[in-house]
Curated annotation (Swiss-Prot):
Protein's cellular compartments: Endoplasmic reticulum membrane; Endoplasmic reticulum-Golgi intermediate compartment membrane; Golgi apparatus, cis-Golgi network membrane; Golgi apparatus, trans-Golgi network membrane
Residues in v-SNARE coiled-coil homology domain copies: 134-194
Natural source organism: Danio rerio
Chain's gene name: sec22ba
Membrane topology qualifier: Single-pass type IV membrane protein
Topological domain ranges for the Lumenal compartment: 214-215
PROSITE patterns tied to this protein: LONGIN (PS50859), V_SNARE (PS50892)
Listed name of the protein: Vesicle-trafficking protein SEC22b-A
Entry annotated with the keyword Aminoacyl-tRNA synthetase: no
Family: Belongs to the synaptobrevin family.
Record-level GO BP terms: endoplasmic reticulum to Golgi vesicle-mediated transport; protein transport; retrograde vesicle-mediated transport, Golgi to endoplasmic reticulum; vesicle fusion with Golgi apparatus
GO terms, molecular function: SNAP receptor activity
Pfam families: Longin, Synaptobrevin
Length: 215
């Protein structure tokens, strides 16, 4: 389930709205994750991946950045990733419609705290069993979540490395992978041509040999 939600202005990490689920039954202490969420938001910038998942033990942080605003959710690790991003994109659409024009000018933290009402209502709809059954419909409307970058929250925070740097490394790895596939294809093509040429030489040699033999 979704345990915590934060909406933050990326430019200066100003919190705009937030919501936390009651977790008294499980007895889990979410303060550690609250601290990690704040640290994470301070690392975001314009070059950060627009969508990312950060693993945090038995929990996962998922976020979406749109129009300079980050929508961050803390979920149990077992909560479907596709539902998490569907939830965040749902929040983004509604928040942008209601407050998008005001976001650049506010200076007070949690200026849109009343948005918590919509957050709570949306969370309930996404943990409902019917929402899980409709996951297939959600899939067709979402970006390919398999392409969303995944990192470890502890590594990101301890290294003090901006998420944009991780995105750059991921892009470099992707480029290297593409280059490797291209080089491999080129080598395979050359190998095929070499085999064909060798076969042609053998056939021509046999033809010449037969002609001279019968002559």
């Amino acid at each position: 389930m979704v345990l915590q939600t934060m909406i933050v202005r990326v430019a200066d990490s100003l919190p705009l709205a937030a919501s936390m689920q009651e977790d008294e039954q499980s007895g889990r202490d979410l303060q550690k994750y609250q601290s990690q969420a704040k640290q994470l938001c301070r690392k975001l910038n314009e070059q950060s991946p627009a969508r990312c998942t950060l693993e945090a033990g038995k929990m996962c942080f998922h976020y979406v950045i749109e129009k300079g605003v980050c929508y961050l959710a803390l979920c149990e690790a077992g909560f479907p990733k596709k539902l998490a991003f569907a939830y965040l994109e749902d929040l983004e659409g509604e928040f942008s419609e209601q407050y998008g024009a005001k976001v650049p000018s506010v200076s007070r933290p949690y200026s849109f705290i009343e948005f918590d009402t919509y957050i709570q209502k949306t969370i309930k709809s996404y943990i409902d069993s019917r929402a899980r059954r409709n996951l297939g419909n959600i899939n067709s409307e979402l970006h390919d979540v398999q392409r969303i970058m995944v990192a470890n929250i502890e590594e990101v925070l301890q290294r003090g490395e901006a998420l944009s740097a991780l995105d750059s490394k991921a892009s470099n790895l992707s480029s290297l992978s593409k280059k490797y596939r291209s080089d491999a294809k080129y080598l395979n093509t050359r190998s095929t041509y070499a085999k064909v040429a060798a076969g042609a030489v053998i056939i021509i040699t046999l033809i010449i040999y037969v002609r001279f033999w019968w002559l």
